[in-house]
Amino acid sequence: MRRRTCLQTILAGACAAAAPAASPQRPIQLHVDLSVDAAQEKQMLHNFHTVFRPAASKQPGFIDVKMLKLRSALAGAAPAGANYRFELTFASEEQRQAWVATSVHQQVWPAIEKTLASKNYTILLYDEA
């Protein structure tokens, strides 16, 4: 009887190990290429660091947000007219969308957007691989 129980335990363990593990959800990244008006650059950076970042960091699922200034294109062409890239990382796309729908986001994003030379910016959504 012990042999049967032992074999059943081994078989159950082998089946559990062979079954694909439930993969945890991976974060998403939103990349936005922005054309910031040179005359508004200091204001945009001030708004990003003192208004947008603190508000975003309090949201459920928030991981990180960065504002990157384009230095140079090492291969290929840089996005036309873009001089900054905004990168936002959330634990899930649903949490990012919930943040976008908040009244706080409706107040803080326009502080960035008003400094842009063009509102025709590229928005790319990535899943972490």
Regions found by a protein language model. Name each.
Residues D37-Q40, Q59:
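Short acidic-aromatic low-complexity motifs
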Residues M1, A18-L30, A39-Q43:
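C-terminal segment of N-terminal export signals and the immediately downstream linker at the start
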Residues T5-A22:
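N-terminal export signals
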Residues H46-T50:
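A non-catalytic, amphipathic alpha-helix used as a structural packing/dimerization or gating element
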